[in-house]
Every structure is written in C-alpha cells, then in structure tokens.
Design a protein with these regions (language model features):
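Surface-exposed, low-hydrophobicity beta-strand/loop segments enriched in small/polar/acidic residues
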Residues: 1-190
Length: 190
C-alpha cells in the first residue's frame, strides 16, 4: 500500500483524452469570470458554472458544472511549458477573463493535476494537492468543491464542501503529465 502525492509546480494542466463536449460543440465562451469570487487567475482543469442571470462565470450559478479548458497561449516555446499557462486578469487589456467551459458527460476521460486549491504563482509548488492510496484505485472518487471549483477526494477532509449531486469522477490511472509532473487520468462516472 503506497500513497501517491499529486501536487504540482506551476499552473494546473489538462490533457483532453476524450472530452465529447469538444466534438459535439458543448462549449460556452461568452461570459467573463466573476473575479471577486473566483480570483484573478483561472487555471485549466477547474470547474465553474455559467450564470446567465448575473452575466458571469462563477461557482454559484444555477447551471451545470463545466470544465475550464482554454487554448494554451505560450509565446516562447523554448522557455514555457503547459505548466506556465493560466488566464491571468492582468494579461487582458479590459481586465476581464473570458474562459472556455466544456460540458462533460458520462464516460468522458481526461488527464489532469488540477486538485486542491488555486496556484497563485506560476513558480510556486502546490505541495498540498492530494494524496491517493493506490492500493485500491477503484475506491477513490472525486467531486467538485463548491467553494473553489477544484476536484477533491470524496470522503476526504473537504467532504462537507463537495457537490455530490454534480459530476463524480473515478480514477482510470495514475499518470504523468507531459512535463513529467504526476497526474491522474479521470473518467466521469456520474
């Protein structure tokens, strides 16, 4: 029985192994983020809701949870990698972040290291990501933390904040991200 720590250096990453929302056009990208509640840095792999009534992307709207997955814009491939991309408020002239949200359905599979909490510096190590007991991966499931939009382990320390009525994800495999960091391949099961 071993414990695998899934932390990250830099920003969270997503590898869209099989996200059907991309193919079927279930993508929304017209509303700005409510930075007062979601912060000034939006990472790939986080979840949010499309709140048409307030005209914002936030964590409390009446809509479904959708995966934030934006096109990575890295301008120096010699010095930058997937971990260096996030949507940062100060990078936009109007100060508004307009992310791309993708609907996930049962059976969708993607790989990520986006767990726990936001990384506010691209050089900071988020060492308190999640610890996974890899002796029985079928027993580990993830739900969305309603207060942060990040995935967390069902039955873990943040269990009271999890939306267990929303999407639930199971581990397919402990994996490695493109830059060598630990990651988890997930499949939506509910």
């Amino acid at each position: 029985m071993a414990t695998v720590q899934i932390g990250r250096r830099g920003f969270a990453q997503v590898e869209p192994n099989h996200l059907s929302g991309i193919v079927t056009g279930q993508i929304l990208a017209q509303l700005p983020v409510d930075t007062a509640t979601m912060g000034d840095i939006i990472e790939n792999g986080r979840f949010a809701k499309y709140d048409y009534t307030k005209g914002k992307v936030n964590l409390t709207g009446p809509g479904e949870w959708m995966l934030i997955y934006n096109e990575e814009k890295l301008y120096d491939e010699r010095k930058q990698n997937h971990k260096d991309f996030a949507m940062v408020k100060t990078n936009y002239t109007d100060g508004e972040i307009v992310p791309r949200l993708i609907s996930t359905v049962l059976g969708d599979i993607y790989t990520t290291n986006c767990f726990g909490k936001a990384n506010t510096s691209d050089f900071a190590v988020v060492d308190d990501g999640i610890a996974i007991d890899d002796s029985d991966l079928s027993a580990v499931t993830f739900a969305i933390n309603k207060t942060t939009g990040y995935l967390d382990v069902v039955g873990g320390t943040n269990d009271a904040n999890l939306d267990k009525e929303g999407p639930i994800f199971a581990i397919v495999k402990i994996y490695t991200m493109a830059d060598g960091q630990p990651g988890v391949k997930l499949m939506r099961i509910k």
